[in-house]
Amino acid sequence: MNELMKILGQTGQSVTFDQIKIQLASSEQVRSWSYGEIKKPETINYRTFKPERDGLFCARIFGPIKDYECLCGKYKRMKFRGIVCEKCGVEVTLAKVRRERMGHIELASPVAHIWFLKSLPSRIATMLDLPLKDVEPVLYFEKFLVLDKGVCESDQIDSYKNGKKRDQYLLDEIRCEDLLDEYPDAGIDVGIGAEAIKRALSSYDWGIPNDQERELSLAAKEKGLPDPFDYDADVMEGDSEKTMMRKKLRKATSEAARKKLVKRLKLVEAFVESGSRPDWMIMDIVPVIPPELRPLVPLDGGRFATSDLNDLYRRVINRNNRLKRLIELRAPDIIVRNEKRMLQEAVDALFDNGRRGRAITGANKRPLKSLSDMLKGKQGRFRQNLLGKRVDYSGRSVIVVGPELKLHQCGLPKKMALELFKPFIYSKLEKYGHATTIKAAKRMVEKERPEVWDILEEVIREHPVMLNRAPTLHRLGIQAFEPTLIEGKAIQLHPLVCTAFNADFDGDQMAVHVPLSLEAQLEARVLMMSTNNILSPANGKPIIVPSQDIVLGLYYLSLEVPEYRETPDEAVIKDGKIVTAAPPAYSDVAEIESAMLSGSLKLHDKIRLRLPTIDAEGKSVRQTILTTPGRALIAQILPKHQAIPFSLVNKQLTKKNVSDVIDTVYRHCGQKEAVIFCDRLMGLGFRHAARAGISFGKDDMIIPEAKATLVGKTSEEVKEFEQQYQDGLITAGERYNKVVDAWSRCTDEVQAAMLKEISKQVIGKPTNSVWMMSHSGARGSPAQMKQLAGMRGLMVKPSGEIIEQPIIANFKEGLSVLDYFTSSHGARKGLADTALKTANSGYLTRRLVDVAQDCIIVEPDCGTERGLTVRAVMDSGEVVASLSERILGRTLSKDVIHPVTQDVILPRNTLIEEAEAELIEKAGVESVDIRSVLTCDSRVGICAHCYGRDLARGTPVNIGEAVGVIAAQSIGEPGTQLTMRTFHIGGAATRGAEQSMVEASRDGIVTIKNRNVVENSQKVLVVMSRNCEILLTDENGVERARYRVPYGARLMVSEGEAVTRTQKMAEWDPYTLPIITEQAGTVEYLDLIDSITLVERMDEVTGLSSKVVVDYKQAAKGVDLRPRLQLKDASGNVVKLANGNDARYFLSPDSILSVENGAEVNAGDVLARIPREGSKTRDITGGLPRVAELFEARRPKDHAIIAEGEGRIEFGKDYKSKRCVIVKNDDTGEETQYLIPKGKHVSVQEGDFVQKGDPLVDGPRVPHDILKVMGVEALSDYLVNEIQDVYRLQGVKINDKHIEVIVRQMLQKVEILEPGDSTYLIGETVDRIEYEGENQRLMENGDTPAKAMPVLQGITKASLQTQSFISAASFQETTRVLTDAATSGKVDTLNGLKENVIVGRLIPAGTGSVMNRLRSIAASQDRQRVGGASPKAVEDAAE
């Protein structure tokens, strides 16, 4: 073969490359690519169907139509290859050169490239330092541009303009003629069109060599002479545009001018560095892409289908030829100008149709697809053909359940297998001599001869196939199985992998793919086999868990039913006689089985069993255990291991318990045992689910007896609230909230009563089936049972508000017409949401993958000392995520010290496995410092120590693992389960009652932090501190729970008091913010002027009035009203507070006064209250939109304002619509001002002391502020907790490290504060890695390094600003990214995954990372052999 190649020469060479550069092309470059100029708009001859000469499909330019055959047919066959036919001018070669050869069109007049004109910010306009709206009229021949004003003064030209200063040298035609007539000899130079712009661009000294200068300097270099055009020399730099702008920047005073200069300077520097000349943005020549990429295809019926590009090119050629003729004919200026404008528009449409003006449409009124449209969007080149391709050797079919399969198998229909493995079968048939030729083999297969089936069996043996179910939301959506041949036409799937595929058997389809090469088969077997994917990559818990009927079977098997007589565990003996016999004893499982067959023993009876177990030394011992026959059957299939005791299954097995059992088996006995155990467990579950025959009827849904009383009690409460409202004690908003609360509580109580009743086990009656299904985790949830047998409860309007009239009936009792009407509302909204949700969730996943795709494990250890401090997550006193859960599988960044003995329990850099986590938990350590990807110091990618354990394998992570993509999938995959809103189970509201008290969640001893209380007139303690917390400790003083107590709450416990579970410790009104006095005294109103700042509001319903503070519209000039209350003592002096300030209380708008002017008050009394109702009826953004909001780092509406430093609060002078709050530091005397809109409630009072990060105005916090004030660790804490809250609400577990990976990607950029001696500009955002490298270089040279602060970017913005322009272009805003990259001459080093997929190489992760490393070692060895580098340097390069 090689000899043949040598003789024939190679057609298209393939070249290896390491990076791709994108740059503007000069006209010379375009000519060098081209194989000839296209002069005619014709495509093919209508009679002969041969391409026209010099036309768009010309064979002379682009190459022959048939392999090795010229157009006229004079030369045919291989022997003439390379000859150019003298008659038709076609080179005799392969026809595929028509995919590679380009042509060009020489333009009669230059045109601007629309990308650089209209892609904002306009590059051409910025380089000329003109606004875009001045450049456009010049380009499209509406106005003239004065290029050189000659000897005229500016004001002389100004008089000819339209009187505006701005459009610097733009004149319309008439004024231009007048000006030239008036000053004929002044040397004024005016121009119009792209030529003028091109001349303007060339007139600057950019400090970039042009083509001739380049050639001369190259020639000089070859001769060893100094470069005559050395642009780096300071001499040249003297007056280049760049230097002048740097000078201007130093002198710039206003921020706006600085910003404008910086913008232009950056662009100029980009051009200078890339070596592209700005005048190349104006083209003299248009390249024409190869004809096979814009084909003309004959349809049947003699018509042709063509690519839109041909139409667009034809317009350009037509207009260009017409323009040439007009110029030759010396046509009047106005005609030529019009033709030039039309040419400009034609070229615009070719490059980007519709970017300017109306899009050019084809015959069917549809806009033509231009070159830009070919790249853009889901159907563009990037996403349609480069990132996602269709593959051969695949098939798809419906799936059915295959319960008799082993975990690593799948059933493949014979017909399908025969088709998929055809080539393999052909080769085997030939090998065994059944067929002599491939053709004969083909015929045998078509006839389906018996020997074909035998060979198919052999071919398929141990050849894995991959099954995929769309949508593939995470990597477990494609897994490999060994096929077993089955009859029928459906694929059989193992039931245990359904969770991973999210498959069910209601008509789902799956695709089969065959890995062909040996390497592919190897990877499929080692990495993708279903038996290798037992754990979920999202949380490290088993994903191969039984569900539905298997769980039900196991639950039924492990039930323990109470008996008529209460059998004690041991025999009761009185006076030497056995009064009550002990449960019967059995020696082994076989004995039990025979007893059950004979009917003397039931599945759920109590028995004693002598069971062989393995003790700590690994010896086998027998011990007697109290259990049931069912549990003994389960124990029989448990692997024998000392860490797996019988007690693991000697309990009621719910889905969660089964999962824990599988987890334990996997951790202790390894993968193989776990897989075998899972298969056996599945068989057992199915068998007993069938034997149990569990079913339920209407009477199994038991309506609790307590329901009527509970509903009655709540109705009374609601009437009471109504009465309070009528009496004017509460506002309408408060009444609504209280009613909703009461009904929520009632619904919960009914549900609890129903669950209690339904789960009762009565002797002699079987366990309730509905309860079994729900409790075991097989099907149904308490929320659904509540609607069946409890009460449906509150419903939701589509707007998210809760309808205060609940549905008291349940489905068993039946709904009335009104009930049905109320509930149809929310139920429909739920369905509509589901449809929207899927698309949104998919888009979130796509953005996450894009931002994290180049996060790969690159080295074992980066050696950093930094880390994050982690503690258990508490939510209203409950531990939501324990410390051990959060640190499992992470590496320690500091030693863990025992809190009591102060010994080092574990040294730093220990990977925390289950045993270590237990050790830390037992020692009572409160917080642990762990390494995190956020603090990893690796330059590219992440190191293995900072990442920790690979969750899907349970081992330390391997180098080359694509952790970014795994993180993105883990966060995106549950996205579809997250609601769009936080409620809906068939429209039912699940907003719990608003928290209005703190109950102890366990027994313990009370410690109160930040206790600041006063006793009010009712002798109740009222909390005055804004960050008071109640801690519950156990007898060893270890904190077990922590509760936040708000300002104004009534405290019911004292320091050191012992409390019991569910004891009330504090309560408060959840719907108002009180303002409470700390001292006794007489109230005095200040600036509370009737009908200006204070109004009496009448309630229409109750006829009662209340005094409300209003936001006054600016009173008379110079009057600064600040409504407030102050306290005076008996002698009329202002009362002083404990901190020495006067007792003054500022009132924000909407406060309702609770005291009259001159009233006597005691400490702890409420002076005024601010209703909170507005914030609570609005639905809190929940679910998916909340996750997206956090990842996009958006500023929430009505966000909190946080203090940037500590200090005391003072109120400054108010402005028209803002209040001024000053935080003054006592030590430094530094003051920070915050302007707060008047309508917002300021949550601090004058004289309060605030810490850094405390809120001055309540509301959701802004991530950017947290980063700026508190730093990276606080930000990561906030984001991780907020995102986890959303997922926890849905019961989805995701490991923190996945969120950290994404946050790391969001923090890739820094903003320059001081440039030092670097070339950076103030306010510029640069890549963190680049910035650190630059600073290192500066410090090595003894220069001042730059200073910068980290910037938080949303995931979309971060993806668009990655180092790789290929990856960014394939994500979004393709044209903008490519325009940007071209101006700065960007180089893509192909580090991420997407870029490599696009250019068609192995991705640098997984197996590909090894190949990459080997390639770089080989390359550096080559360099060493050539250049003689030291072996040490080569090793460094390989590292």
UniProtKB/Swiss-Prot annotation:
The enzyme's E.C. designation:
2.7.7.6
* Cellular component, GO annotation: DNA-directed RNA polymerase complex
Highest taxon listed in the record's lineage: Bacteria
Q: What class of enzyme is it?
A: transferase
* Gene Ontology terms, MF aspect: DNA binding; DNA-directed RNA polymerase activity; magnesium ion binding; zinc ion binding
Task: Provide one Gene Ontology biological process annotation.
Answer: DNA-templated transcription
Residues in the signal sequence? none
Per UniProt, Zn(2+) 2 binds at: C862, C936, C943, C946
Q: Which residues does the annotation say bind Zn(2+) 1?
A: C70, C72, C85, C88
Name what cofactor the protein needs.
Mg(2+); Zn(2+)
UniProt-listed Pfam families: RNA_pol_Rpb1_1, RNA_pol_Rpb1_2, RNA_pol_Rpb1_3, RNA_pol_Rpb1_4, RNA_pol_Rpb1_5
> Mind listing the UniProt keywords for this protein, alphabetically?
DNA-directed RNA polymerase, Magnesium, Metal-binding, Nucleotidyltransferase, Transcription, Transferase, Zinc
Catalytic activity reads: RNA(n) + a ribonucleoside 5'-triphosphate = RNA(n+1) + diphosphate
On cofactor binding, the record's note says: Binds 1 Mg(2+) ion per subunit. Binds 2 Zn(2+) ions per subunit.
Annotated HAMAP family: RNApol_bact_RpoC (MF_01322)
Oligomeric and partner information: The RNAP catalytic core consists of 2 alpha, 1 beta, 1 beta' and 1 omega subunit. When a sigma factor is associated with the core the holoenzyme is formed, which can initiate transcription.
State the family named in the UniProt similarity comment for this chain: Belongs to the RNA polymerase beta' chain family.
Q: What is this protein called?
A: DNA-directed RNA polymerase subunit beta'
Q: From which source organism is this entry?
A: Gluconobacter oxydans (strain 621H)
